[in-house]
Each structure stands twice: as C-alpha cells, then as structure tokens.
C-alpha cells in the first residue's frame, strides 16, 4: 500500500511538471527566417526588425548583409535564404530568369536617389555636380560596378553626365556602398557617389547634390521569396509587414521614396512552391 501511494505521488508530480513546462516550451519554439539584404538596408532593418519580431513571436530573423550582386550569386550557388532584399530590383529579375524566385512574390517596396557626398570634416571644394566639370578633384569614390548595384548606377550617371572621361583617372573603387562611405569619411576620397539611403543616416558624410533622375535607371528596392525558402509563411508575413503603411512611413526616415507597388500583398496561398 505504501509503495502504491509513493508511485501515485510520483505520477502526480510528473503530471504537474508536464502541465507546467510543456506549454512554455511550446511557446518558446520559433522558426528562423533568413534574409539576404543589401548593405544600404542595415540602418533601416536595425529599427524595423524588432517590431516585426514582436508582431510575429514565432519567427526569429537572421540577416546576411552584402552587396546585392554578391548576395544574388550566393543564392544562385544554393545559399539557404528565404527572402532576398537587393537594392536594385533587377537582381531579383536575374534570379527569376533562372527559376529561383517563387512566382508572384516580387514587390517593389521603395525607391531612392543617387547623391554626391563629401566629408563634413574635410569638405571638398565642390558644391554641386556641375562643379566637377571645372574644379579639380584628387579622388572620387564610387562603387565597383562588378560587385555592387550602386557602382552600376553611378557608372550610368557619370557616363550620362559626360563626366566619365574627365574623372576616370581619379576613381577609387569601393566593393560596396559602405566601403564608398568609409573612403569619404576617412578622407581617402574628397567626393563619393552613393544612394541617399546610404548617406542620410551617416554623420561622417554630408550630401552635396542629387543626380538627375534621368541620368540613371530607376533605383527600385525590391523583395521576393527565394524558391528554396524553408520558412515560406514567415517570408510572406515579412513582405506584408514591409509593404504596410506604418513601415512605409518609417522607411522615409532612411531616405526611401514611397513604395510603387502596394497591390497584391503576399498571402500564404500565393507563395507555395
């Protein structure tokens, strides 16, 4: 009888432990969401992601930052990515041509402009883009068009403005936008050409002028779900969050223009591979 009571007590204690701990353990389970994002999105995502995660507690976000072209190549090579956030939507199109994007998930969530920057500590003798035609510049930092989208767009601008022949010998190339910012901030280049989204929150540089919109292809920030995505549900939730009016207002603080694509928010049924 004594043994029976002891076993009964142990059973009740085990049941109580199960009732207390199992729900908490279940709630603690989260699913990772891997995002490959352009370097120019660092500041914006640092603000936005905590909000997204608080709204979706079952999702834990992991971000891989880098130049858009490099991230695209990693995805082509099979990198485990759920969501692709390049700074030029055409990088998504390149993946789409290879069948690496889930149909119907590409959206344009914002745009920006191309700007001329200098260091506030060691300012360049120029004030506008037109000054580059007459005032000598020792070094001008631009993105490498082979590795970065900002380099491709800057090359278009310099060619359109007919500044390329004059300034080409003064170019200092940065692998990506952050590298261009660093070259200017450290005084290794007097002038730099970057996206407004890169420069607007960086206290180490100052915006001098904006390149005419017609001097380069539109700078459209896009998002899409990668074909091999493991967390499709979380990816769809993130795109809806990105296109929401509240997020759009927040993005303006980081140099983004209003989203051009607000139709057809991603729903779970639309993103099944």
Over which residues does each language-model region extend?
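Active-site phosphate-binding/coordination module
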Residues: 104
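Short hydrophobic/aromatic segments of transmembrane alpha-helices and their interfaces
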Residues: 8-9, 165
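Exported/periplasmic ABC-transporter solute-binding proteins
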Residues: 27-56, 60-65, 69, 73-79, ...
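Bacterial N-terminal signal peptides
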Residues: 9-22
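Generic low-polarity alpha-helical segments
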Residues: 7-8, 55
